[in-house]
């Protein structure tokens, strides 16, 4: 709005000023005729009062500057004027009505109407009265003689108009006669007299006594009377404007018309006397100075004009301010609208968030209520068989503060506690059975290790009554009982390994009804709990892959550790696809659920484990968007299904299926229909029945290639010529850090089994490393007298002598990564001749040249012990330095071409 006003204002202002000037011009022009006639009347009065005796022009006195010059004869007393005017003859009254139109045509510069003017007798008295009113009126209508106005200046007299007037006048047919006693004024004098009258407004010479002058002025007086009757008095402003115009056009005034010579004797004496009498009376009255009045009027008019212009400017400014105020108001309204929109958006967002949160809470509450109701119903359906198990657990396992019914725990179970939702069990199967927890005291602490185990072997369930077996009746080999993928060995006070087998019996069903979080570390218990550990049931029920359950007792405790423990189970799916695999005890929950779902004797239920390889490009389709397809498979088949990633393998992933034979077959059938190109062969294999981990062959080491220069870093230095290096550019190197983290999480918890005694040489184990870390190590020597062993760190290098008790058994999945530390010897370098070992100075120099930098190594040959001999270079800027030669040049070693070969 303000911008439009600013653009229109400069255009509108000149237009307004032009319009005002046009109006002012025409208003002044309209008053031109009346002001001119008034001046003519004044000039006629001066001629009537002129002294006939004065023949020569008198000096002009500037009474009114810039306007007119007044002769001294104008100020003569009226008596003298009467004596001069009384001699004039009278003129017929018809002259007063016929001659003024001619003079009006001359003053206006327009040709008069040539039609004859009708004589109107009887108007002489009225005309004289009007003349008297015009001459003797108030000061506003009278023209002072001291400063007469020069109206004739601005009038152009044309000869044509004069001739027309002469022809139309009734006196044009009268022969011109010279009145006795009145000499005829020559044309030159008359023209000069008229010029003086036109510029000064009064005649200052003696020629004023001429009859034609008196006639002319009388006619002008008649015309002035008529104009006064119409205009009711001219304004001073118009007179002043005409005066200015007269001054500017004075050079264009034509001389007096010589042809107008009238007979003085025809003038009526009565008219002249009455006119002279009235003029004398008007002269007798004192007139105020016109100069002061005009100056005041001009000042007032200027002030009025200035005030008008100021008022207009103020009005324009006010309009501008109003426009600006309107713009500000519109901006404020826009801002208020934006603020309101933001408030509405915020309120809508809050309402939507509140509705979503309330709906989520309602769904969760409904789910928890259904699960709790189902658990309570299942617990009520359980008969005396369950009650016979409860007292035993409360007396032998559970403490007084933990003897709460399982239903109370189930009531607070979270939705993801592994319990099936209503409608999930397979068709035709009875309601699942719920059992009282035997391991409640073992799960009293929160979880610390959330790394789940994926692979597991088949497990059959045994009755909880087996827990009543006294601890002294346990077999001698109970210390090395096999554990499943979710079992952890517990340590007794005598540091004897007593594994806790949690899978047999109804005790495993506690994980399906308990609301507590599952964890590997939660199975750690007191010696009292370990004393009642039951033995494995002797059963010969075969697995689906032909392995007998009875063979489990011959397996070592280490074999229960699967290679998929640290794998990522999500595979891009949501937590629903994972169900209960977020802890070490997830297997037992599924087993108990499937056993209860089958509705058969737990002793006769087999758990089938089926694993298939899934190419990487099919993993996303198998999981589905947000895990929907995996969830569909689990709900439809009733089996436990999840996707795991094999460590250090990116091309394929493993689909793990657990459940009964019926559930597994149904899941495989659904998968085979969707993925016809997928190989459904079971790749799962149970652990080998070995008591101890065999020593790994040298192929498990990541060795340096022969004859090829590779980039290495030195991770450990035995001496100046004996080093351990890592190939930090190898594809498997990045997995070492992840392996270190997983080993730290696993072995920092208590209850991990130690190495069996006697310790076998070359066995791989987990040993404490630097800064509390756990590293992979190999036993290279044993000292039975001190119960110590010497180990070699297979990833970070170095030798160390430690107690056997500090070593721990290593899980099989922790040894799948090739050993990253390569043991090497410097080629062609040997200690000085007097020493069998390198000096400390040589060791320090070697450490300085190889520390915290990447080096280039190349295998040249092998030592008699099988260690590779290498040439080692360091790159300093653009210079490559051979470290082998540098040691010799510094005098810290000697160069021998075949030192290790001669040994």
UniProtKB/Swiss-Prot annotation:
Residues 344-357 are annotated as: PKA-RII subunit binding domain. Isoform 1 is detected in thymus, prostate, testis, ovary, colon and small intestine. Isoform 2 is highly expressed in testis and detected at much lower levels in kidney, pancreas, liver, lung and brain. Gene3D superfamilies: 2.30.30.140, 2.40.50.90, K Homology domain, type 1. GO terms for cellular component: cytosol; membrane; mitochondrial outer membrane; mitochondrion. Residues 96-128, 175-210, 225-260, 274-340, 513-544 are annotated as: Disordered. The modification Phosphoserine is found at residues 105, 107, 151, 169, 429, 445, 573, 592. The keyword Isomerase does not apply. Residues 758-817 form the Tudor domain. GO terms for biological process: antiviral innate immune response; apoptotic process. The modification Phosphothreonine is found at residues 70, 447, 533, 590. Pfam families: KH_1 (PF00013), TUDOR (PF00567). This is A-kinase anchor protein 1, mitochondrial. It comes from Homo sapiens. The gene is AKAP1.
